[in-house]
């Protein structure tokens, strides 16, 4: 009887990965990158690294097939959010309890990364034993997904992914295949006013009051946008605001950082017009203020492609493994595959992984072991299907 801690399966890899701190910001990805590099098979596997930021790397492992493009690609990020507080479990402990593994990244997305590693290693073993691949198989482990997603941008720039490739991330999707994304546009909006004593406010121009007008107008404009049949409604969050100096001083400066999640047909250019109009109305309402803005993030929406070859194959594999009709939905956040789809126009990008996104980024984050087992089986089956594995 093999002890599971000695069996190099996705459950084992999940625990090993969770025990390595790869928080962003914090310890970052180097330890986990080095660990993955150390466990990957060397025979028949081409391993590449690429520096994304100082001492922060992407890692790619490739088993070459007769056809290099399209390749089947698993892309998984190595970083997690910060460990945080209010845990009742050790965030780096990988404790197994009642069919769950606890720890930072257990759900998002070290269990998904573990499933991809396990599937890749199994295909590598089968190739070593004499199987041949028609299409190449790649495992890309990316940096910085939890921040500005510079890892996947570097992978695109390095040519590690192509428009024609079949690409899947293993983000937590709660048993669903998620194939579409709302766009994500970020703005930094600033209102400049005129300072004055609070006893004579008419001598100044209240930047905070003007920003309140901007926020109100943007919120109402976003609420008026039509919903999308798959992606739902567009939303806006005013995540951070800074303004004023003291309660008794008319504020001469206010800045707000805005996160918009946009559904078709609204894009960043259209959102920019909403911001411009909001600033204009604030300037007309509060005399003496002047507003300006900059776009700090621009990720386009990604719509479902009913004709996607990867989608059909992934659904068939998932249905066969689970014995159920796997649901197809959209991913509420933005992922590495969404960046690839939006940048390259790749219509074969999607998410499927263990865990529930609602558990991510929280204390006592966990993933169900049965979820890991399911996903591992699906990924192995998908890898064999998409690479067109053949006997010698």
Language model features with spans:
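Alpha-helical metal-binding/catalytic segments enriched in His/Glu/Asp
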Residues: 74, 95-146, 187-191, 202-222, ...
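Short helix-capping segments at alpha-helix termini
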Residues: 43, 127-133, 160-161, 281-288, ...
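Acidic/histidine-rich catalytic neighborhood of metal-dependent amide-processing enzymes
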Residues: 109-182, 387, 391-392
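Short coil/turn connectors at secondary-structure junctions
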Residues: 67-72, 98, 132-137, 161-165, ...
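Acidic/His- and Gly-rich active-site-bordering loop/insert found
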Residues: 1-106, 125-133
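Metal-dependent amide/peptide-bond hydrolase catalytic core
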Residues: 5, 48-51, 82, 172-173, ...
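Short beta-strand segments
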Residues: 75-77, 140-142, 168-171, 190-192, ...
